[in-house]
C-alpha cells in the first residue's frame, strides 16, 4: 500500500498583492511549505483610466510552481471553509486588505471588511475545521497590521509596547484586527503572530505608495511634490519584510507575539528624493506642507524582533532604491 503524502501548505489571503505574492515565492523557495494557496478577489485599487503604472499582478507569480490561485473574498465563510477543509494549510497569512491608507480612509466599510470581518471569519473557519478534522497540525495564523496603529509617534522611536492611538480609519481598522486576532486566538487556542510593517517598497509594487510615486516621477522627469521636508518614514524593502515575516511565523519565540518588521531606521522624504537625485541629476521637486491628517511617524524599533527571532534587515534605503531602479531597467 502506497503511503499518502500530505503536502505542507500555506494559505495566503491577498496573495496576488505586492506583499502576498513575494511571501508566497519566498515560502516555496525556502521550502517552508511545498504548496501555496492564494485567495484573492482580483481587485485593483488604482484607476485604469488615470494610472500610468504597470499592472504587475500577472508577472508577480508568473512561472512559479506549486501555486494554487482561488478567486474570492476572505470574509466569505463558504470559501474559507472549503479551502481549509481541502488543503489543511499549516500556516495562514492574512495580508488581504485595501493596500493604502488613503484608500481605506475613503472607504470605511471596505476597510473593516479586510481587517475586521475577514480576520474574524478566517479564525472562526479555522476553529470549525480543526474541531472536525483529526490530526490537523496547524502551526500559525499571521495577521498583517501596520505602523499606522501607533498614530502620531510620541517619541522618535516606537516599540511594540508604545501606545496605540490611531488617528485615521486605516490605522483604526488595523488595530481592531489585532484585537480580534488576539482575542479569538487566545480563546480558541490558536497560535498567532502579528506583524507591523512600515512604508514597504520594491519591485512590482503598483498601488501608488509614496516610494513608487517618487521613482516614477523621477523617471518621467515630472515634478515631485514632497509633503513635509522632514517627514520621516521607516522605509522597508520588500525582501527584508518577507524574511522577517517568515522568521516570525516559524520560530517558537514568534508564537502569540507582535513584531515591528521594518528597516529600523526612519528616513525623511527629502532624503529619499536626494538619493534619487544621484541617479537623476535633473530631478525636479517642490517642498510643500505635510498632510495634517497623516500621523507623524519615524523609526520603529526592531530590537524585539532581532532578539527573539533573529531578524536583521539587509537593505539600506540607498541599496533598495538602486535595486528598484535596476528592476525597472532605468540604470
Locations of the language-model features?
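Hydrophobic alpha-helical packing elements
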Residues: 19, 79, 111, 173, ...
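Residue-level signal for the nucleotide or nucleotide-sugar donor/cofactor binding architecture
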Residues: 75, 106, 114-117, 161, ...
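Nucleotide phosphate-binding site architecture
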Residues: 102-105, 150, 164, 201, ...
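N-terminal Rossmann-like NAD(P)+-binding domain of SDR-like oxidoreductases, especially those catalyzing
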Residues: 1-196
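C-terminal substrate-binding subdomain of Rossmann-fold SDR/epimerase-dehydratase oxidoreductases
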Residues: 218-331
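NAD(P)-dependent short-chain dehydrogenase/reductase
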Residues: 53, 155-156, 167, 179-233, ...
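A short beta-to-alpha transition loop/helix N-cap that caps and shapes the active-site region
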Residues: 45-49, 151-152, 203-204, 268-269, ...
Amino acid at each position: 500500500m502506497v503511503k499518502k503524502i500530505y503536502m505542507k501548505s500555506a494559505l495566503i489571503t491577498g496573495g496576488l498583492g505586492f506583499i502576498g505574492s513575494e511571501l508566497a515565492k519566498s515560502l516555496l523557495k525556502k521550502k517552508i511549505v511545498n504548496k501555496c494557496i492564494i485567495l484573492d478577489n482580483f481587485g485593483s485599487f488604482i484607476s485604469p483610466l488615470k494610472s500610468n503604472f504597470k499592472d504587475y499582478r500577472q508577472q508577480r507569480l508568473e512561472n512559479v510552481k506549486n501555486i494554487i490561485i482561488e478567486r474570492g473574498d476572505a470574509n466569505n465563510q463558504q470559501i474559507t471553509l472549503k479551502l481549509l477543509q481541502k488543503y489543511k494549510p499549516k500556516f495562514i497569512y492574512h495580508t488581504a486588505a485595501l493596500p493604502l491608507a488613503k484608500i481605506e480612509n475613503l472607504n470605511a466599510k471596505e476597510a473593516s471588511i479586510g481587517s475586521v470581518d475577514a480576520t474574524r471569519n478566517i479564525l472562526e473557519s479555522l476553529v470549525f475545521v480543526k474541531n472536525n478534522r483529526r490530526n490537523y497540525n496547524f502551526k500559525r495564523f499571521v495577521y498583517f497590521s501596520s505602523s499606522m496603529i501607533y498614530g502620531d509617534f510620541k517619541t522618535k522611536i516606537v516599540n511594540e509596547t508604545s501606545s496605540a492611538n490611531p488617528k485615521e480609519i486605516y490605522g483604526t481598522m488595523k488595530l481592531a484586527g489585532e484585537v480580534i486576532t488576539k482575542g479569538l486566538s487566545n480563546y480558541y487556542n490558536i497560535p498567532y503572530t502579528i506583524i507591523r510593517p512600515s512604508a514597504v517598497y520594491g519591485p512590482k509594487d503598483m498601488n501608488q505608495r509614496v516610494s513608487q510615486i517618487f521613482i516614477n516621477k523621477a523617471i518621467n522627469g515630472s515634478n515631485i511634490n514632497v509633503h513635509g521636508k522632514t517627514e520621516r518614514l521607516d522605509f522597508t524593502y520588500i525582501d527584508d519584510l518577507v524574511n522577517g515575516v517568515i522568521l516570525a511565523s516559524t520560530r517558537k519565540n514568534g508564537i502569540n507575539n507582535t513584531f515591528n518588521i521594518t528597516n529600523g531606521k526612519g528616513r525623511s522624504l527629502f532624503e529619499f528624493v536626494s538619493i534619487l537625485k544621484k541617479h537623476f541629476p535633473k530631478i525636479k521637486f517642490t517642498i510643500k506642507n505635510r498632510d495634517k491628517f497623516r500621523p507623524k511617524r519615524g523609526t520603529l524599533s526592531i530590537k524585539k524582533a532581532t532578539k527573539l527571532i533573529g531578524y536583521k534587515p539587509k537593505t539600506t534605503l540607498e541599496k533598495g532604491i538602486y535595486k528598484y531602479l535596476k528592476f525597472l531597467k532605468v540604470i
